[in-house]
Amino acid sequence: MMSSRYLILLALPFVLGIAANPSCGESVALKFNDPKPQKYQLTARASEIDARTKPHSEIDFVFANEKGAPADVQKASVDTQVPPRGKLVIWLMGHNQTLFDQLNSYGLHAIQPHYANKWFAICCKDKPISEHCRGNIRLEAATGQDFSDEVDIPKPDGMMERSFQFVQWLAAENPQGGWGYFLTKDGTGLRWEDVIISGSSHGSTTAARFAKFQKVSRVVALCGPRDQFQTWQSLPSATPENRYFGFSHVLDSGWTADHYCRSWELLGMHKFGPIVNVDNQRPPFQNTRRLITSFDVNGDDKRAHSSVQPGRSAWKDAKTGEYMHEDVWRYLYTHPVDAVGKAVPRDESCIKNQKQ
């Protein structure tokens, strides 16, 4: 049962200085109303927020691991000391608080919902693989709608609904954080136009697949998208093509198999600038959407894969310990989407029509 505090919150026409405009249904700019501005980090289990949720052990989508530890813990953070941009990053991969700290420093809200992402090692094992198998599962995992015969993920267990339920909980639990801004006027969903959908590797691939279906503020794909045998990348997109951004290391195996060049071009990202090596240029990187790095990872392709997000594999200044790609992350998540580079031709050496 929802708390009285929660019900009152949803009933109010404004939340902490966030007023609805009755003439057009849009909202004014988000402003924090926090008497003690600070950084907030919040956690909640999906199964405790929404009683409709269920585990799906057949795809290792469960509430607890083999040792009984909670597996459905969701993370969120916001820094009310920083002027808010009114954008919510939904992160589709393992929680990375260092990344969330960076996002919060840009004035972004960030959450990591618990959603189905371990099916990759279980499903779509036929060879040759169907060109729609993984893409359809990704979409069902994200939406909770029936797109695949391989899985059965209902609405309460899809990323969309779990994110919505989480933000509702955050709005009640942490009103100082202004989370209610991201709820629709009627309180029935998220304002997806203000959502930045993002992830790394497998998660970035699902993020891009979801953005084909649902219009979002932007997509940030770190070391992705992958799926070189799938065709969803060339489908019509609800999210405008100029809103897709990607960043990867040249030694990442995704380049060896043409995952990245293929996905980036099929998504239309070449229409907004060339591939730019961020180690040789400064922001705004020719306003492009396709960024790479070639910093020394001692030939380690696994480190290369994870090096494009904050963490131990990332490039740091040897003296100060500061991240060398901080400007890149800021660009990826905050660069104006309407500021675009000049279109370039497709790379004919990148194999787009791949078969097993």
Task: Indicate residue ranges for each PLM-predicted region.
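N-terminal cap/lid segment of alpha/beta-hydrolase-fold proteins
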Residues: 27-80
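Bacterial N-terminal signal peptides
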Residues: 9-17
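Alpha/beta-hydrolase fold nucleophile elbow
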Residues: 185-199
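Alpha/beta-hydrolase active-site loop
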Residues: 132-187
